[in-house]
Amino acid sequence: MPSVIRVRGARVHNLKDVDVDVPLNEFVAVAGVSGSGKSSLALGTLYAEGSRRYLESLATYTRRRISQAAKASVDEVAHVPAALALRQRPGVPDVRSTFGTATELLNHLRLLFSRVGSYLCPNGHRVPPSRNVALEVPLTCPECAESFYGLGAEEMAFNSGGACPVCEGTGVQRVVNRASLVPDESLTIDEGAVSPWGSLMWKLMKDVAREMGVRTNVPFRDLSDAEKAIVYEGPAEKRHIVVATKTGGAELDFTYFNAVATVENALAKAKDEKALARVEKYLITRTCPACDGTRLGERVRSTLIEGIDLGEASRLTLTELREWVQRVPGLVPDEVAPMARVIVDEMTEPMDRLVQLGLSYLSLDRASSTLSNGERQRVQLARAVRNRTTGVLYVLDEPTIGLHPSNVDGVLAIIRELLADGNSAVVVDHDTRVLAAADHLIEIGPGAGADGGRVIFQGPINEAFHAPASRIGPYMAGVRRVERAAGESDQGADIDGRGALHLETNQIHTVRPLSVDIPLGSLTAVTGVSGSGKTTLVLESLVPALRARLAGEPLPGHVRDVDAAGISRVNLIDATPIGVNVRSTVATYSGVLDELRRAFARTEEAQAAGLKPGAFSYNTGSLRCPTCDGTGQITLDVQFLPDVDIECTDCRGSRYGAQASQIRRDGLSLPAIMAMSVDEARVAVRGLKKAGAILETLAGLGLGYLTLGEATPALSGGEAQRLKLASEMGRRQDGTLFVFDEPTIGLHPDDVQVLLNVLQHLIERGATVLVIEHDLDLIRCADWVIDMGPGGGMEGGRIVAQGTPTDIAANEASVTGRYLR
């Protein structure tokens, strides 16, 4: 029996012919600084090959219907099991997916209501629970003797027979927002007053309206009520119109679509996101009035267990639901109690595991699309364990993202369960507690990008603590820590001296009324377990309230008061990807390419050829590669196999045509500079003051390893945040509040140190910095901490403690404080 996965000559992304043996049936951690090549080894090599080879064993007909990974750039991967990946950014589910469907707990809950619920007979009488539903025989009403069948579990699903007929199981209604149909009533219909007729319908609809008796040459506000009624609600009647053409005119019989019908017609025909986006601006979304957002039909909602229906049970938090279902066997008649106990026992283990993973505050009706990446990944993790597979390689990409330190033990327990079932686990992570719990460590580095891609340590975890080559070992051993500049942290918030932002709110969601001060000119961390109210406090209350106050607009409804205290600008820096396609690169986003294009247009060769700066754009310029249109890659549609994106064979990924390589500045062409890293390009742009300053800033942000031509959507969350900060680094920040949402996501402790230096630079320039954070190293370095909790959901929503990190550590009520001691 092989004991290791044998990898030889791995060259995925920046890996440099890596040879490594990955132990099977063990907890293997993969570490390294951001951009070192960790994910390239774990996901790009091990998972890609494990999943691809498994899929290749399936029939061709089956493979056509499954998205497949391309073959990894590697010489040999031997003894790799079938692989499953739990990615850092799971796909966003559709509108019909909920926390209940994703965890499959809703399946059990539907079965419980189907089998032991109390039904209404067709005449409206309540019928007590009976085994008849399970036996598939009719129920008989004790009052009117009417016989009828109960509902099966599938018939209670909002994705099938149990759906509300009004909203079709979505829980919401999209209705036309009449106020958006005519945004400017000073315009005439001929001038485009009726907006959807211009963007969603043929423009000749105004001609049809004229034939319907509506004046189209007067301002809309001056139309009579009858004319406006025709515009908004007129009947779908045919009218004879004459349409101007190049040869004179054409006569047509055309059916009238009023403004509301135009939007409804476009919505019904929308088949993709692009089409839906065109319609969205004319719609408002509201809770379905028929089912009150439960998604369920009337008969499903009429089935009760001790006065609670399926919709109400789905709105309970996981903690509340766990307590309620345990009581159900004692609440129902003895006839069905054993059946209830079996169903409840099936629910108990998955619920306990989800609570262990810190998801106790979520309810089953919570839309999956509203869950964070970390929450969705933990749902995946819980499902993986419940499947009880064996012989599978699980590749976990940073499973502790967005996880409070108190829930890390839950993740580790699940990884151990996977191993106990006979599986192997490869975990990419930066959390030193996770790494220290592993059996084996593979560390990639030593640096990022071109400076990484090599194995700098491999072996048992205890050997890494003192290995000279390891960069993570000293952090795991506790001999090295992330530190802020001497004398800056833990000095407290000088609220009296510098002033403070002040916010007062009423209750919203599970967050109680709050009154909070955030010191100016300081680094403040907002902490707390998942669901404790951090996001609600900062992103749903403070940020929109400040922006409204600065714009002179009304405050959000739940905000009682906000004192901006001299803040004149709010800058939210989050980890969302930059751009949506490969045309956005580091050079374009940072502004470096703009100056490079102007510089190359000034060269003698360019002037002789009559080339302007626009010609050097790989998106629209004449010098872009004609084969790939400036994307650097082409997509091959191979039948029976997945689409393959390959490097453009003509430009070799440079995005430029051959002529661009002939135009040189200081001996270098623009394609050659675009292929350089930020650090390398700093030398190549000598004499270009603005470009040089931008590159210096990027290097100071720890992004020196990125290539100028690297597509921004491929950057990690941490890289995206720092790139967004680049434009802010060189100027005064007086009166600016920077808000960061978990800026340490995906960061190695060395990268956290770089980030902390950046935050300190902003503060020294006059800024106030507020971070939502779980990382203990950054929290220890804050001036002020606001700890939310103590739990998640209904058990949270309060400020448990405020003060310096030392104050929080000494507070017995603070869950975060326990991990700061």
Regions found by a protein language model. Name each.
Residues M1-R821:
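Conserved phosphate-binding elements of NTP-dependent enzyme cores
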